[in-house]
Amino acid sequence: MSPAFRTMDVEPRTKGILLEPFVHQVGGHSCVLRFNETTLCKPLVPREHQFYETLPAEMRRFTPQYKAVLIFVRCADEFGASGNIETKEQGVVSVRFEEDEDRNLCLIAYPLKGDHGTVDIVDNSDCEPKSKLLRWTNKKHHALETEKNPKDWVRQHRKEEKMKSHKLEEEFEWLKKSEVLYYSVEKKGNVSSQLKHYNPWSMKCHQQQLQRMKENAKHRNQYKFILLENLTSRYEVPCVLDLKMGTRQHGDDASEEKAANQIRKCQQSTSAVIGVRVCGMQVYQAGTGQLMFMNKYHGRKLSVQGFKEALFQFFHNGRYLRRELLGPVLKKLTELKAVLERQESYRFYSSSLLVIYDGKEWPEVTLDSDAEDLEDLSEESADESAGAYAYKPIGASSVDVRMIDFAHTTCRLYGEDSVVHEGQDAGYIFGLQSLIDIVTEISEESGE
């Protein structure tokens, strides 16, 4: 059984697992689902799947760990689906679309484990929704569910689905206008659980993707997802910066219209000038106890100076600059640049670079503190006074730099590509060098 499924196996067979939206998704338009604490589900794009399957060894530490392929296959009824894992060891899940009490679409996975690792196929009754799992209210979701005429119900159901789709489009338009948002966080609570219904970008991507999947269920037999490492799982308050890298975003297979649109976006943003632009940001501001969200529409409007200020804001917690993070970031950016300079014929068109660190404030502890103080460190509340730390727990200064999104990546290993490039991806490397220069400038100006 794939390691990604061990968590599911300990659950009773009648219980389901809610495939939640990944609340720390700050950019992109693909729906990313949280499979478990350490694993994410992302819609499979053949080219991206090929990239992970043929990934050069020296690039692995700069990308999320690739785990498996998950296939959702439509069940006998229009609202059900089953899935299996394409790994050396087989595992199977059944999935269904349901609605929560707020009428939002949910995708539920039910583990099906047979003897000796074989697959059990069960009838649809085993896929009934579990009220405890989804925290349903006892009231009926549809007043029309009790109607005798099925045609009336179907007509009403289709009408409601169209209204939902239209509402999602309106909410996305609102998101485009609301380019920077703030959300107050309770310090004692789990940040990820608090954000389940409040990260505006991940929620809208989630609902839009599930709505499309449900609408297309009658015309499509299966959906494929890849399982990837959840890069934010080891951070208590993940601060995430999504940077669109390179001077060119369209793939070689893009239509003329698509290519022209991507060229225009690059020309009108910092992509053309410095080879990088902000695609999304989530940062914790300790001064106000708020998470700040910046979306890609704001990122496109930034000047080079505005980009630098956004980068400064990402490393600033509202009280002081997190200077201890700048050195590790520079080290990893420099190492990544050296690795990419050795990659022949690769082009990472429309790929992003994630920078992640923990926004949790760690209390100041002196070096002569007793063992009990150090043992209880992770449970103490944040120190309200700003200043340098005499002692930092392991991970307090940890920062991660990873490449993601390879749907338009190409190299000569992909034999079916009509265009084969020579040498390095100069546009991506140019963007990395710009990042290195700007972070270095921020570090020097702050007295690092």
Curated annotation (Swiss-Prot):
- Please name the pathway: Phospholipid metabolism; phosphatidylinositol metabolism
The record's section on InterPro entries has: IPK (IPR005522), IPK_sf (IPR038286)
Signal peptide location in the record? none
Q: Name one Pfam family in it.
A: IPK
Q: In which tissues is it expressed?
A: Highly expressed in brain and lung, and at slightly lower levels in liver, kidney and testis.
Major subcellular location class: nucleus
Question: Subcellular location, in the record's words?
Answer: Nucleus
Which amino acid positions bind ATP, per UniProt? 229-231, 242, 405
Q: Where does substrate bind?
A: 238-246, 258-265, 408
Please give the catalytic activity noted in the UniProt record: 1D-myo-inositol hexakisphosphate + ATP = 5-diphospho-1D-myo-inositol 1,2,3,4,6-pentakisphosphate + ADP
Is-annotated flag, keyword Lyase? no
Domain of life, per lineage = Eukaryota
Q: What processes in GO biological process is this protein linked to?
A: cellular response to flavonoid; inositol phosphate biosynthetic process; inositol phosphate metabolic process; negative regulation of cell growth; phosphatidylinositol phosphate biosynthetic process; positive regulation of apoptotic process; protein stabilization
GO MF terms held by the record: ATP binding; flavonoid binding; inositol hexakisphosphate 5-kinase activity; inositol hexakisphosphate kinase activity; protein-containing complex binding
Q: Which UniProt keywords apply?
A: ATP-binding, Kinase, Lipid metabolism, Nucleotide-binding, Nucleus, Phospholipid metabolism, Transferase
Instruction: Name a single GO cellular component.
Output: fibrillar center
Q: What is its EC number?
A: 2.7.4.-
Answer whether the UniProt record assigns the keyword Transferase to this protein.
yes
State what this protein does: Converts inositol hexakisphosphate (InsP6) to diphosphoinositol pentakisphosphate (InsP7/PP-InsP5). May play a role in the regulation of Na(+)-dependent phosphate cotransport, possibly via its role in diphosphoinositol pentakisphosphate (InsP7/PP-InsP5) biosynthesis.
Family from the record? Belongs to the inositol phosphokinase (IPK) family.
Q: What is this protein called?
A: Inositol hexakisphosphate kinase 2
